[in-house]
Structures are given as C-alpha cells and as structure tokens.
C-alpha cells in the first residue's frame, strides 16, 4: 500500500537565503503531496537553533507539534533535539479554501 505520509525537507545555498525560494518550492511540494499523491500528513522537522527553517514552516502555516527530545543523531555522533511541525490534508485544504497563503 502507498504511504499516507511524507517528510518535507529542503536545503538552500546561503547565497539565496531570504528570497522565499524554500517557501515557494515547499508550496509546490505540498500541493503535489496532498492533491496528486493523496497524502494525509506531511511532516517537517528542524534543529531548534535553525530559526530560518522554523520561519519557513511558520510561513507555510504548518502547525507546531513540539520538540522531539534527542530525536536525531548527526554524523558527528552528537544527539540533537528536533522541532516538529506537521500539516494534515485537512489543514492544507483549509489553507487553500481560505486562501491563507495569499493573505500572508
């Protein structure tokens, strides 16, 4: 059976920070995930100190779910917390119906 959920991730070169590329690309991925793949949930996580990535999630109106304590191990071996956001298909269609992205 196909998966009902996916994880959204992105990397942007520092040369292009602040131009909104992560937000625009993520909107396209969310649209494809919910409208074409019929996903029920898309998750997005980042390190607590990554304020830019948290801001992308906020601009996309991802509901905040909390902190996954010691949720990730880096290549260096260091264990880090993860800030967790997730959007359901219900959230997405409400955003689309009410045109909330356009109002931001």
Question: For each predicted feature, which ranges?
Answer:
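Acyl-donor (CoA/ACP) binding surface of acyl/acetyltransferases
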Residues: 1-104
